[in-house]
Amino acid sequence: LYWFFLYGFIGWGVEVVYAAIKTHKLVNRGFLCGPICPIYGFGMVGLIYSVSLIPMPDSGSTSAVAIFFIGMILTTAIELVGGWALFKIYHIRWWDYSNMKFNLGGYICPQFSLLWGLGSVLMIKVVHPLLARGSSPMPFNIMLIVDVVLLVLFVVDVAASTAAAIGLNKYLREIDELRAKLRVTSDKLTTVLG
């Protein structure tokens, strides 16, 4: 859980900076209220696990090429499934690559898949080893307490954010139904007035 929350937080920070550069203002880019983007947590935990399954060569280090392809495929799959699921459940897109060439449903595109592959190499070869060294002195019982507290906060945030999104969807549905009724009335009036 520790890595999930840490990388979810780092991912949230990356998203906020990216949005700030594009929009020139600070925006919470996540679905959740708290400072975490779970898709980054899932992506990094999945990547760390996947890379750990690769047999080590004599050099004792997984090749950057292998990490690139594993990371590119894994993160693209997570982005596709996550984007599709979020849209189907909440009817909101948190990212949209529709304007990019060769995109698939606006959920994924090769340009970002290549960036995820490069990012995977950077994270596994540079960032993760530094963070692992920095967190190894933390006693297990402290880490367990931190994980439990973060998990409780995360579950509450997911529940509250989901309730808010579902409430918003209901409200938007009601507005759409009202719009449709107004359209029917407008069409009837147009017919009567000729």
Predicted features, each with a name:
Residues 1-194:
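Aromatic-rich, lipid-facing transmembrane alpha helices and their immediate juxtamembrane interface loops
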